[in-house]
């Protein structure tokens, strides 16, 4: 179930500057905090693909990934426009946002309606429905491809690194700390 997480002393103030983000549950028991500002971006220009030292991984390994910060940092170092966009945002309590794991990206596409319903209540928030229906993950598939959640098909697939897909700022939460509430 999605819910708005407010900054300290801002409960009920539905302006972008008063929220930490929108929290969603993931299939693996984790929670994720999404900042509702999005952009259609390339994951990586093909001329920079060799700067991303990450080896490609299988869909299963990408779905098992439980941390997005190191992968986002590697993409940022390689010159990723998508990583550059998402890392512009940070949470007072949780630090810098990153690109979603593949599982988180799939949950975003699955929970789009619920997320957008909450985003409509927040002044200044973007709606997922206004952007590309594929969401970049922080995982590489192969030399020229990255993993995306393909929203209209409800599945994961690979996409060329230089294709514009949605970059969604996200922080994975420590479930042992009961989210951020």
Task: For each feature predicted by the language model, list its residue ranges.
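An exposed tryptophan-centered "aromatic clamp" motif
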Residues: 75, 79, 83-98, 102-161, ...
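Extracellular adhesion/carbohydrate-recognition regions
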Residues: 1-93, 164-170, 178
